[in-house]
């Protein structure tokens, strides 16, 4: 789910600053001209980038850009609100958050480039195939047992528990396949965006450092809810399996890439 940014009941258009960033990133990316033409950019509510669709699909892709990609001088921090805070003193308790939310142009370009490459319809199709297979398998297994009259003599409660167990197995299998697949995709697109050039690599490192810094500050400002959302390192908290690659891992990937490139003789 995403939310378009509206102002005066109209969709807020991209500012000249953001349009300039998008133009530079599209110029640097390796997509074909027709693929670039399938991308649409819009303002999105929140502080995270968003993407959907694919440049390799007939419908194209969409990328949502948060307000923090605007020129910091144009942002009215007085109108920003945190959940559980009617107001926030941006000069005192919010100063560190402002610093964490403020990105250089290189960091913004890395984020945009990563989202552009992430607009791949095959990732969506892979997820659809995985989910279909993981839930069809237990369904077919249960149908076969019913057809062979294997479990029909069991009490209703026992049969119900067995059905639930079968589909729970399918869900666990789905997560065990889907999550690592998403992690691999995240690594691939992070690296692809970073190798665009030295500025993108440096921007990527800053991008993830700032996200970790932001999450740690939000953990403190949001109190108990913040502790449930983020750990002490700034990674998002998940129960058991992690659907997203931890931010710390993504940062370390780029830092290792930077070390490898520096080790290569000029």
Predicted regions mapped to residue ranges:
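Peri-catalytic and regulatory segments of divalent metal-dependent proteins
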Residues: 1-116, 120-121
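Short helix/loop segments within enzyme catalytic domains
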Residues: 11-37, 146-225
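Polar/charged alpha-helical tracts
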Residues: 16-27, 99, 152-153, 232, ...
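Active-site-proximal gating segments in proteases and membrane effectors
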Residues: 44-59, 194-266
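Long, contiguous hydrophobic alpha-helical segments, chiefly transmembrane helices and signal peptides
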Residues: 63-65, 69, 110-120, 129, ...
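Structural motif marking the loop-to-transmembrane transition
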Residues: 105, 121-129, 153, 157, ...
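Hydrophobic faces of alpha-helical transmembrane segments in multi-pass integral membrane proteins
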Residues: 113, 134, 138, 165-169
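Post-HEXXH active-site segment of zinc metalloproteases
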Residues: 122-150, 207-214
């Amino acid at each position: 789910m995403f939310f378009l940014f509206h102002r005066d009941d109209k969709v807020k258009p991209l500012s000249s600053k953001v349009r300039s960033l998008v133009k530079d990133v599209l110029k640097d990316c390796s997509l074909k001209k027709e693929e670039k033409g399938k991308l649409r950019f819009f303002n999105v509510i929140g502080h995270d980038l968003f993407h959907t669709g694919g440049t390799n699909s007939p419908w194209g892709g969409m990328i949502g850009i948060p307000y923090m990609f605007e020129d910091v001088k144009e942002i009215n921090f007085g109108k920003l609100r945190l959940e559980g805070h009617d107001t926030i003193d941006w000069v005192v308790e919010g100063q560190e958050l402002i610093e964490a939310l403020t990105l250089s142009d290189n960091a913004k370009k890395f984020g945009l480039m990563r989202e552009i490459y992430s607009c791949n319809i095959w990732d969506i199709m892979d997820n659809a195939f995985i989910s279909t297979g993981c839930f069809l398998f237990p369904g077919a297994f249960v149908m076969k047992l019913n057809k062979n009259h294997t479990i029909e003599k069991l009490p209703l409660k026992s049969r119900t528990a067995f059905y639930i167990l079968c589909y729970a197995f399918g869900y666990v299998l789905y997560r065990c396949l889907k999550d690592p697949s998403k992690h691999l995709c995240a690594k691939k697109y992070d690296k692809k965006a970073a190798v665009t050039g030295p500025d993108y690599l440096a921007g990527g490192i800053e991008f993830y450092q700032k996200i970790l810094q932001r999450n740690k500050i939000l953990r403190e400002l949001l109190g108990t809810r913040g502790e449930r959302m983020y750990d002490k390192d700034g990674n998002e908290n998940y129960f058991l399996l992690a659907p997203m690659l931890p931010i710390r891992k993504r940062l370390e990937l780029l830092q290792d890439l930077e070390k490898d490139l520096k080790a290569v003789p000029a």
